[in-house]
């Protein structure tokens, strides 16, 4: 039985990975939402709950969900993405100022926890939504990191767990294209980095998302704050 533990934020990328796992007929999918002290964690959690509720009665697989509290794990680390950090920068996703949003070793920590969960549950894969657009900014989203972690986790779990990153070499636009074709509920997802009810439409993450929909000649179905490019 194909199975996976998925790092699930409720964002566009992880929701599309969930759609991919369902399309690939994984029979058991355990979604894990990490609450790690980021500015947008509260709204990500709301989105994650909504997406999983949407899928719960509509998919032919065992779909489970867990929230993991890592609120103290990144204490003392510098990142504008964290509640303890400065303002979220605005501008294009690949702009140099977006490096302020790097949370040191975040995916290293997440994947290690997911690997332990998978091994203990007898699940042979863990999945993460890293993609080509992340490579310029986030070192723990690059192909060489994925390759190293896949090897380390495979060996560290006595050859029982693999790391899946199905969109590693895809752009955000290509991810949206795949998700639309596979009925991903993008209207329920949350991408914005800011701590506010409606997405800002101005931070790098929002900018990249809006650009991806535009490149597919689509309007993003989520509502942005006044002054942003509302769908």
Give the predicted meaning of each segment:
Residues 1-182:
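ATP-dependent adenylation/nucleotidyltransferase module used to activate substrates
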Residues 124, 131, 223-229:
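AMP-forming adenylation/ATP pyrophosphatase catalytic core
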Residues 178-181, 186-195:
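Short, intrinsically disordered, charge-biased short linear motifs at domain edges
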Residues 108, 112, 190-211:
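Local cysteine-cluster metal-coordination motifs and their immediate loop/turn environment
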Residues 137, 198, 204-227:
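Iron-sulfur (Fe-S) cluster-binding segments and ferredoxin-like electron-carrier domains
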């Amino acid at each position: 039985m194909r199975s996976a533990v998925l790092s699930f934020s409720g964002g566009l990328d992880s929701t599309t990975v969930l759609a991919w796992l369902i399309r690939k007929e994984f029979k058991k999918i355990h979604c894990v939402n990490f609450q790690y002290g980021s500015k947008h964690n509260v709204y990500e959690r709301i989105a994650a709950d909504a997406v999983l509720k949407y899928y719960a009665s509509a998919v032919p697989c065992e779909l489970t969900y867990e929230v993991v509290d890592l609120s103290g794990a990144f204490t003392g680390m510098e990142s504008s993405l964290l509640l303890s950090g400065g303002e979220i920068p605005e501008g294009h996703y690949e702009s140099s100022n977006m490096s302020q949003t790097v949370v040191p070793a975040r995916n290293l920590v997440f994947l290690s926890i997911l690997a332990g969960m998978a091994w203990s549950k007898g699940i042979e894969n863990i999945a993460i939504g890293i993609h080509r657009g992340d490579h310029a900014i986030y070192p723990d989203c690059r192909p060489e990191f994925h390759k190293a972690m896949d090897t380390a986790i495979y060996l560290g779990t006595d050859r029982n767990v693999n790391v899946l990153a199905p969109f590693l070499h895809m752009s955000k636009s290509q991810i949206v294209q795949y998700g639309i074709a596979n009925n991903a509920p993008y209207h329920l997802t949350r991408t914005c980095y800011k701590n506010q009810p409606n997405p800002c439409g101005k931070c790098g993450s929002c900018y990249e998302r809006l650009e991806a929909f535009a490149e597919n000649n689509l309007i993003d179905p989520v509502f942005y704050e006044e002054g942003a490019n509302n769908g």
